[in-house]
Amino acid sequence: MAELFLATNSDFREVTDFINMVFDKNFPEFMEKVYTEENFMRAEHYCIRDEGRLAACVAVYPQTIRCGDESIECAWIGSVSVSPDKRGMGYMKQLMAHVNQVLVDRGIPFAYLSGRRNRYGFYGYEITGMRNYFTFEEENIRLTIGFDACNEYEFDPLYQEDKEDLESVMKLYEKRLFMVRTAEDMVPGMKTWEYRPYVVKKKGEFQGYILIKGDEIAEIELVNFENVLNVCGAVMLCFGIENLKIEARTWEIEKCRILAEKCERYHIETLGNMKIFDFKKTLGYFMETERKIRNIKPGKLIVEVTGEDTFSIEVTEKTVKTDIIDSEKADISVTPSQLIRLCFTRGGDFITGFDS
């Protein structure tokens, strides 16, 4: 008989071996922040054991997002795996339903995950988020500042033991709208997905940091971001890269502006999948974040979410107020999926699926 259980530290080796097998990866290297014996309990692994061995697993990683002084708790869903010989038996449906209920019971307002849109749409997740990619080619450097202007920069690997560099990196990182990383887990967190952190220095002086894998920089923070073209040229020289791609999130307005002015080309992609459990709290937090980052005009919108509630979202010059109401006619009526696309993808009417 199949048994659903929450893994404990004693299950570390069995769970890790299982997901290594399903994904054909070495998770202790791929995701050091969780898949070591000392870090394993940072995540919750909900598993099904059938006939004495693991058949399926879903991991829940608690996360905190912070913008300035405001933060919100959420969850990242990962390591979604089923043994090849146990597929089609409904174990993933059982685990995902269980995890969703656990998060609802805890009051977690939303969860997100990476993966196939239509696979996870079955469980109520919708494609969400935007990220911008800016591509720099050798000609961008050669025809502007020249590579000689890049020779003074160097890149030192960042280790957890490098207290002085780590402190400088943390100060830059904490200026972002970001997933909270503590000083203790900063480097293991940065190394997730096989990225590698480097400190950027010029004549021995700290200039910032990059998070790089192959020809892609997933994070870049500089003391003076106007020097990004010099740093790009130095990265190309140091790492032997001809075409360098830099990722920046939509809310990083000034960073995107500078990168767009200096790069060869750019494109936009969606980010992942999201499921909202508490619409009031989620909308309230991200609308307030949007107000702080952008110049949103004061106003009020009544939104009816099919199968949920009707919400009043009121923006003033100083705050955003989100309430559940039942006395006013809605300005728009949307499904939960349409709401996520409307609020988090910036794709226009043809993406949101309704006429604004």
Across the structure, where does each feature detected by a protein language model lie?
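Conserved GNAT acetyl-CoA-binding A-motif
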Residues: 96, 101-115, 239-250
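Short amphipathic alpha-helix that is part of the acyltransferase structural core
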Residues: 1-62, 69-76, 142-184, 215-216
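Amide-forming acyltransferase catalytic core, primarily the GNAT-like/NAT-type
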Residues: 131-240, 280-297
